[in-house]
């Protein structure tokens, strides 16, 4: 017979996200693989204060040629539907073009997670044309349509460079013929506003003030890891933010979480359930740490997903993923007076 306090003891041992799943009688496991998300390294030409990767110009962790070749071989053999290239600034890796061309030749839809300012850096005048010729989908970070808010999060001069880059992409057909999506992160420890409403505001402001067009806006909740976690602790707001995320847990998001159909690959080829788990070192294992070339898509189906309290960021409100909100059915209280959002 089970000890009367067994359930309470088990709940205490669970992370806060696992407790929410258990309370709602939900499980989280992988479905069929759709997206192979590849982190090409931690180097970036920026050092944004919200960055969950801790990326910066001084980082040296970058994917080597042998790793890129082994990943390219896997892509050609298993042909994932989507290949999503991220960093750091993925374009800084010398094997970026090789991986784009390999994935496109394998029939994959290719995504470049671009910080926009890389397009204005010396030595990257080839980049915009290369992306357009290969019909690469661009998901670009622009945390606000107001210059001051961008300056606070990303630094001086970043907004002007981002607008210049967007105009360059528009001239090549991005935002009309080719997909150009923007990403919004709240400035502080709040949840994003409803995605559709904010997208309308972005489109109006960028077109009116800068003549810039884009396809869609993705809202992403800040993950309580890396630099953002450091800021929360410095402000003594860690517990407050975790409580906000837990209070906003939305069961409707779980089925659509990106970790169910996305596989995250580190710059050394290591495997993770998502990019956030990658930054926390939660590597997939099968008695030993797994690398991409150790598995097939079929090996991963129905596998359980490693979780932590940070996963609450993906299930609060309308949910959050690398392609924005995961449901249009938020919990009502999140957009009322009790919990503020950052427009």
Please place each PLM-identified region on the residue numbering.
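Radical SAM enzyme [4Fe-4S]-AdoMet core and its adjacent flexible, acidic
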Residues: 1, 139, 147-259
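Conserved alpha-helical substructure of the radical SAM core
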Residues: 4-87, 91-102
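Core AdoMet radical
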Residues: 35, 55-64, 78-93, 104-123, ...
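Generic structural signal for well-ordered alpha-helices
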Residues: 36, 72, 100, 128, ...
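Short loop/turn motifs at secondary-structure junctions
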Residues: 47, 79, 134-135, 176-179, ...
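Distinct, well-ordered alpha-helical segments
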Residues: 97-99, 122-128, 193
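C-terminal accessory regions of radical SAM enzymes
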Residues: 246-280
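Flexible mid-to-C-terminal extensions adjoining Fe-S/redox cofactors in radical SAM and related proteins
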Residues: 270-343
